[in-house]
């Protein structure tokens, strides 16, 4: 009986990276429930057996994928704020965050049946890791921008959270206007009032 080829650490790393890319694409286009291990493996050009040498479950891949997306998003937002260090720069970072939310609804809309189907299969400790600490994220973004608030931190956070939640009204808004333009106007106006 011929032996199966052994994957090197580099091969494993490359396959994991490719699987996470495919997982993100499929999560955006068809959701968690409709994404199967078999279809991911076919697209990645690997066997299902190879998948299981890298991940114990489908949920492990999805968890690793959402962690990667969150980390990438944080890095992008913090980089904009570190590079610009102005109110305009902070507003630009919020616009980028809004665009990410628009392209990846599972980042903000965690109450959908599809996301709930994913999250309920995770161990409690993993669920805690998935939950994005948005207040801490806000605090770090403000710190990266070196901006000073005109108001209490929790109020500023609440205002920006409410602003970002307008993504939930995008279908209603898109009937009469470009919801990105509306968001951009609001963020530019509010950032001027929130920061010194």
Predicted regions and their residues:
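Short, hydrophobic secondary-structure boundary micro-motifs
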Residues: 106-111
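Basic, helix-initiating cap at the start of DNA-binding domains
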Residues: 1-30, 38-39, 43
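Hydrophobic/aromatic-rich alpha-helical bundle segments in the mid-to-C-terminal region
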Residues: 145-189
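Generic hydrophobic, amphipathic alpha-helix propensity
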Residues: 12-23, 40, 65-77, 138
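Hydrophobic alpha-helical connector segments
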Residues: 64, 78-105, 160
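Helix-turn-helix
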Residues: 26-60
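Amphipathic alpha-helical packing segments from all-alpha helical-bundle domains
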Residues: 120-161
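Short amphipathic alpha-helical elements of helix-turn-helix/winged-helix folds
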Residues: 22-26, 96, 166
């Amino acid at each position: 009986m011929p032996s199966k080829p052994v994957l090197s650490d580099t091969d494993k790393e490359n396959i994991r990276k490719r699987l996470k890319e495919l997982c993100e694409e499929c999560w955006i286009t068809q959701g968690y429930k409709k994404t199967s291990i078999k279809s991911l493996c076919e697209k990645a050009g690997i066997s299902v057996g190879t998948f299981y040498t890298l991940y114990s479950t489908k949920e492990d891949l999805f968890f690793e994928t959402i962690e990667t997306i969150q980390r990438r998003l944080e890095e992008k937002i913090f980089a904009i704020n570190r590079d610009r260090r102005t109110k305009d720069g902070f507003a630009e970072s919020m616009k980028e965050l809004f665009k990410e939310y628009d392209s990846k609804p599972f980042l903000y809309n965690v109450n959908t049946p599809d996301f709930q189907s994913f999250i309920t299969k995770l161990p409690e400790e993993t669920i805690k890791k998935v939950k994005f600490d948005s207040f801490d994220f806000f605090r770090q973004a403000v710190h990266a921008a070196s901006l000073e608030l005109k108001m209490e931190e929790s109020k500023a956070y609440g205002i920006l959270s409410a602003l970002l939640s307008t993504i939930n009204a995008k279908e209603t808004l898109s009937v009469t206007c470009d919801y990105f333009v509306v968001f951009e106007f609001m963020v530019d106006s509010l950032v001027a009032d929130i920061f010194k």
